[in-house]
């Protein structure tokens, strides 16, 4: 019975995985971010650059309504000086909940909502999107590489080729742009097989390519290529979704070290308490 259930489950998994592979999932790059792994940390300068890209490019459409502006000065993040955070907040206009009047933003306010109704909020985007899925539709890859949210964002931002797939020539959806990583957009019928399954990676997205080389000018003179800016803003959005990530890692490391020391002490104590008993031989009365 157990063997039959196992075979049935394996068959279902293979079929669902095969369907997912045949559907032409989006292509996601594996980016070696500094914060990955148990000992990884956010790069403060990268987060500051990512904030600049978000402010000058992404914020025109996308909001981050769950992120308080004051968190920009907190440890583990961009760590901007408090005077810079206050100055940064003033560029936003918010509606005071008590008076109902518009006023300049304060560090205690949150980032604004998305400017467009159909523009996704980016507060939790790095946690809401999965870039890695593993073979045959399983989550094995996520066990080793993580969910891959930042990689997904990076891949979408850099996934606009100069030419669309040949199957779409002359049949591209109006007002949409082909993206190798975006999976849930529209696909012309010419890029589908007889069963209606798309035959190309990615799909068409309403967002035009948001980045181009040297679109922003970094104060530290860092490279401002499309790939560099995409990596910076992806890291920043990961921090926005997980602002306490470094603190959690530190707490986890401390807990592991404490439990390790405690285990050693308990082992030595147990050995000492039972040393006199375990060393004696039983005698027949």
UniProtKB/Swiss-Prot annotation:
Listed Pfam families: Cytochrom_C1 (PF02167)
Binding site for heme c: 58, 61-62, 207
Gene3D superfamilies noted in UniProt: Cytochrome c-like domain, Cytochrome c1, transmembrane anchor, C-terminal
Domain of life according to the entry: Bacteria
GO cellular component labels: plasma membrane
Annotated transmembrane regions: 251-269
One MF annotation (Gene Ontology) recorded for this entry: metal ion binding
Record key words, sorted: Cell membrane, Electron transport, Heme, Iron, Membrane, Metal-binding, Respiratory chain, Signal, Transmembrane, Transmembrane helix, Transport
PTM: Binds 1 heme c group covalently per subunit.
Location in or out of the cell: Cell membrane
UniProt membrane topology term: Single-pass membrane protein
Signal peptide: 1-22
Function noted in UniProt: Component of the ubiquinol-cytochrome c reductase complex (complex III or cytochrome b-c1 complex), which is a respiratory chain that generates an electrochemical potential coupled to ATP synthesis. c1 functions as an electron donor to cytochrome c.
SUBUNIT field: The main subunits of complex b-c1 are: cytochrome b, cytochrome c1 and the Rieske protein.
Name recorded for this polypeptide: Cytochrome c1
Biological source species: Cereibacter sphaeroides (Rhodobacter sphaeroides)
Biological classification of the source: Bacteria, Pseudomonadati, Pseudomonadota, Alphaproteobacteria, Rhodobacterales
Gene name of the encoded protein: petC
